[in-house]
């Protein structure tokens, strides 16, 4: 299972949010570019980047995001406010490894499925769930989709992954989160990436045994030093098969 060290940007700073609440971010006083380089130096294969300003239609982080793409030293999976084919192609042309699309997918599934076919392995479907409904517009609007129907609507579209976030689940209720994620993974035709479920090595150990889960985002736990990136990646590796000792 792949670990995606995760950076979330608001007003040029690294932050984490509580249940998607943009009004009370936890601000981490670190340099975004140096932090991203640190992810690469630790051996990460990808990083995930969410631009919370772009979610609100504000492009003020654009220069910083472009700098991260150029200098981080590892491919970036970018989410936040990518709501048209033009925006998706803009970032792909800038060199981003993958674009994460949620709101556009809820409103125009056919266009997003077509985009995934045109850019195979570069489009990730975001499934952000609040009280059993898929949320759009930066988690501010409840759409008409259940998570199950949303995933099913895309059939065999060649997404690079399906990023599942259970926004309202209490972080202490890991069983509920894993239930949602594993249920969607059973139905999905693309590998599922779990978001918002990793607080410790134990959480990674549980997650890696769920079928069709290809990766997990790890953000807050890295910034508050609950777990190191090296520990997270080591834990995510499959356990070695026992080898019989021959005397």
Curated annotation (Swiss-Prot):
EC number: 5.3.1.16
Reaction(s) catalysed (UniProt annotation): 1-(5-phospho-beta-D-ribosyl)-5-[(5-phospho-beta-D-ribosylamino)methylideneamino]imidazole-4-carboxamide = 5-[(5-phospho-1-deoxy-D-ribulos-1-ylimino)methylamino]-1-(5-phospho-beta-D-ribosyl)imidazole-4-carboxamide
GO cellular component: cytoplasm
Sorted UniProt keywords: Amino-acid biosynthesis, Cytoplasm, Histidine biosynthesis, Isomerase
Cited SUPFAM superfamilies: Ribulose-phoshate binding barrel (SSF51366)
Any one GO molecular function term: 1-(5-phosphoribosyl)-5-[(5-phosphoribosylamino)methylideneamino]imidazole-4-carboxamide isomerase activity
Localisation per UniProt entry: Cytoplasm
Protein name, per record: 1-(5-phosphoribosyl)-5-[(5-phosphoribosylamino)methylideneamino] imidazole-4-carboxamide isomerase 1
Gene name per UniProt: hisA1
